[in-house]
Amino acid sequence: MRRNEASPGVHTSSIVYRLASPGPWSHIRRAWAVTSKDAAQELRRRVALAAVFFFAATALALVSYAIGPFGLRPEDRAPVQAALLWIILFFSAATGLPRAFVREEETGTALALRKVTSGVLVLAGKTLFNYTLFLAIAAVAIPGFAILLEWNVSAPVQLVVIVVLAGWGLTAVSTFLSALVAQAGQKNVLFVVISFPMLLPLLLFAISGTLAATRSEGTTTAIQVILAYDGAATCAAYLLAEVAWEE
């Protein structure tokens, strides 16, 4: 039993060294090693993942009573539903995404990662894991939202595109900000205070695109803006990753 409970630092170093051997694909292997490490840690604990999904389920239940079949009239629900969906997705993600780098500081594995790989690759690996987590949250929350609130989407394919693209921007920014607040005192509060203004433009166009998909209207403008935001956020995170991770 004691043999299996290796320290987090040893576990982190062994994974990165094993998968980061020199070669043409070494960068991809290093980023994937970080993703695998985070996934293994979360699956082993399950507490953080359970908290994220429990928050999403609780929010869905409360919202369904407020504006569901016994609340607002059907013709008045669409704008409120689009906004509430992204509020639920944002705060559900904010429950788990900030722990990307905070976890390394708390478990003492940050120093090991700094020694064996670059900040860009650490950020890439953690962003990939967080993006997978966001998609899992969306895959659970959106069907539940549609059932509990009797939400009808006229263009489901467009909705999926909006969620996938906006989810990447939300994840990229959140993961980068997690590196900035990892060593702060009030990490969770600081993360929400910093992230909301930066994510507000993305969330506004995500809500706009979701509403358009609900009404089978054009989503081209929303998708273009979200793509531009994703590109800018990804480039900024790439350029500043080393500074955020090392400092």
Description of each model-found segment:
Residues 42, 94-112, 127:
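Transmembrane helix boundary and interhelical loop/hinge segments in multi-pass membrane proteins
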Residues 118-145:
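Selective transmembrane-helix segments that form parts of the transport pathway or gating/packing helices
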Residues 162-196, 245-247:
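A structural motif at transmembrane helix-loop-helix junctions in multipass membrane proteins
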Residues 15-52:
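Aromatic- and glycine-rich beta-strand/loop motifs that create alpha-glucan
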Residues 66-80, 143-164, 210-223:
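Membrane-interfacial helix-loop-helix connectors in multipass membrane proteins
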Residues 17, 231-247:
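Junction motif at the cytosolic side of a transmembrane helix
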Residues 46-69, 84-91, 194-205, 229-236:
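Hydrophobic alpha-helical transmembrane segments of multi-pass membrane transport/permease proteins
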Residues 81-101:
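Long, hydrophobic alpha-helical segments
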